[in-house]
Structures are given as structure tokens and as C-alpha cells.
């Protein structure tokens, strides 16, 4: 929907119409689509002769969806408030000329990919190289945009290792050839703290591990306001992952991940580990 009111129509009073057919105002973007977590700049064009004398006013019909603020050079910045649809309006200060454009605010669930180990993976992965390194903050999502999500080791691991192993999951080899691990006979429990999550939003956690060994079942326990458990056999694992769905963070926006040998782990050192994790927002 795009409506223009120019020479034959007034935004306020038909008796005050400026009949010059040379004068116009127009939003350059006939429709605007943006995510809830981003802003957008829109611009307006006015006729060349009188443009400098026009003072433009910007507004949105529903301020519960977005707000708009005029800036220099006949532009305005839109800030989303909530998912929904509304209309942008620009008008001259005298109310004689105005123009409308559609605005749609959407929310695409964020997904973050994390690769554990010293060999970096390309985007969209966030690379956590060593369990003794500082944690990751403002991780990039699948679109390459910063998020509020962070991850840090809060229960130590034995270390990291690289075995050069491949996968059949479509992941880069760099994601499957290195990992964080622990020998359970020395470190029976390892884990992460995931921060910056949104209260009231549920998340899915997906894990992948691969080692050329035997009996390395790993238990993943994800804990927020609720919790879930999954078991993954890492032995020669080219294509198996596990998911824990529907996890809601605690009141601080935090989820804890605890890892330990699974009940069927018979590896001599009680080896357990993880190569990659995928953190996904679930749609409401």
C-alpha cells in the first residue's frame, strides 16, 4: 500500500491545497521491512525548486510497532518496538503535502554456531579455541549479526585436542577435527555458562562430538528454569547429533550446560567431549 497526496489532495484542509503541480513530497522507499533488533533509515524526496523550504514531519500510525525520528537531509530513523505492521507518514509542516509507505517489523529466530577447538571454522561459526580462554560475548548469529549471547567455561575441561576427523553433516572439516574434552577419571564434570538469553524465550541446544575411540558416550545436561538431558556416542561419529529443546533461561537470562561421561561410557579414561554446539531461538 502506497498512497501519495500531492497537487489535488491536502493532508489537513482541502481549502489550503497548493495547486502547483511542481510541488511534491515522496518517501523513497515504497515499503520497509526490518527485524525487531535493527533500525532503518528512510529518506524523502521533495521537488527541487521548493525542497529547501519544506520542513518535513515524520510519524508512524501505530507507535506500538515502531517509532520514527527525523534527522538531517530529509531522512528519518525507524526504531522497532514490536513485531507487526503499520504505516510511515511524511508531511510538510504546513500539512499540504504528505506521503505514506508500509512498514513491516519481523523477528527471525536467531541461531548461533559455536566451534570448540584450536582450528578455526569459517562463518557462521563463533570460534572458542581453548577452554582456558576468556569466554565469547556478543556472538554472531547465522546472518553475521551481533547478538547478546555469550558462552564461557564455568566447569573446567582437561583441554582441547585435534584428530583431523571429517563429518557427513555438511559441517566444515574444521568443525569436526577438534574439540574440548575431559578425562572423566580426573575431571568428572565439565560445563559451560550461556548468557544473554531472553526471558520468556525457549531455546534448542544441539551438540556434536567426534573421536576415533570406543565407548565415549557423553551426557549433556542443559539447565535453565527447566532442564533436559541427552546422550551422544562420539565414537567414529560422522553424522550423529543430539538436541535438547524447549529450554527457558533462568531469571538472569542464563543457561548452564553440564557434561560428563554417559551411563554407557566404558572408555578407559572416561573420555567425553564436544566439537560443536548450535544455539537456536524457538519460534513462539
Question: Where do the language-model regions lie?
Answer:
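A short beta-strand element within beta-rich, extracytoplasmic domains
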Residues: 190-192, 199-213
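Surface-exposed, short loops/turns at beta-strand junctions within beta-sandwich domains
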Residues: 80-84, 198, 249-251
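Low-complexity, Gly/Ser/Thr/Pro- and Asn/Asp-enriched, turn/coil-prone segments
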Residues: 108-185, 246-284
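Short, surface-exposed beta-strand/strand-loop-strand elements in extracellular ectodomains
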Residues: 209, 213-228
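Extracellular carbohydrate recognition and processing domains
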Residues: 227-249
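Extracytoplasmic soluble-region selector
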Residues: 12-109
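C-terminal motif of bacterial Sec signal peptides marking the signal peptidase cleavage site
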Residues: 7-10
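Extracellular recognition modules
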Residues: 87-91, 206, 258
Amino acid at each position: 500500500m502506497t498512497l501519495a497526496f500531492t497537487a489535488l489532495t491536502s493532508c489537513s484542509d482541502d481549502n489550503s491545497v497548493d495547486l502547483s503541480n511542481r510541488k511534491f513530497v515522496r518517501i523513497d522507499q515504497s515499503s520497509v521491512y526490518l527485524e525487531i533488533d535493527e533500525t532503518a533509515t528512510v529518506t524523502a524526496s521533495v521537488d527541487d525548486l521548493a525542497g529547501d523550504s519544506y520542513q518535513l514531519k515524520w510519524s508512524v500510525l501505530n507507535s506500538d510497532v515502531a517509532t520514527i525520528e527525523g534527522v538531517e537531509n530529509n531522512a528519518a530513523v525507524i526504531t522497532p518496538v514490536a513485531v507487526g505492521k503499520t504505516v510511515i507518514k511524511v508531511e510538510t509542516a504546513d500539512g499540504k503535502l504528505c506521503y505514506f509507505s508500509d512498514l513491516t517489523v519481523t523477528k527471525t529466530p536467531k541461531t548461533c554456531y559455536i566451534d570448540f577447538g584450536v582450528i578455526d571454522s569459517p562463518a557462521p561459526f563463533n570460534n572458542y579455541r581453548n577452554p582456558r580462554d576468556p569466554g565469547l560475548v556478543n556472538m554472531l548469529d547465522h546472518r553475521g549479526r551481533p547478538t547478546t549471547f555469550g558462552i564461557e567455561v564455568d566447569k573446567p575441561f582437561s583441554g582441547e585436542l585435534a584428530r583431523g576427523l571429517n563429518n557427513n553433516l555438511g559441517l566444515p572439516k574444521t568443525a569436526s577435527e577438534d574439540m574440548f574434552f575431559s578425562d572423566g577419571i580426573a575431571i568428572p564434570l565439565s560445563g559451560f555458562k550461556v548468557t544473554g538469553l531472553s526471558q520468556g524465550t525457549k531455546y534448542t541446544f544441539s551438540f556434536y562430538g567426534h573421536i576415533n575411540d570406543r565407548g565415549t558416550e557423553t551426557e549433556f545436561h542443559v539447565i535453565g528454569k527447566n532442564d533436559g538431558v541427552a546422550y551422544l556416542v562420539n565414537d567414529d561419529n560422522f553424522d550423529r547429533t543430539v538436541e535438547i529443546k524447549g529450554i527457558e533461561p533462568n531469571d538472569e537470562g542464563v543457561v548452564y550446560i553440564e557434561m560428563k561421561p554417559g551411563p554407557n561410557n566404558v572408555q578407559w579414561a572416561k573420555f567425553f567431549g564436544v566439537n560443536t554446539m548450535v544455539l537456536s531461538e524457538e519460534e513462539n
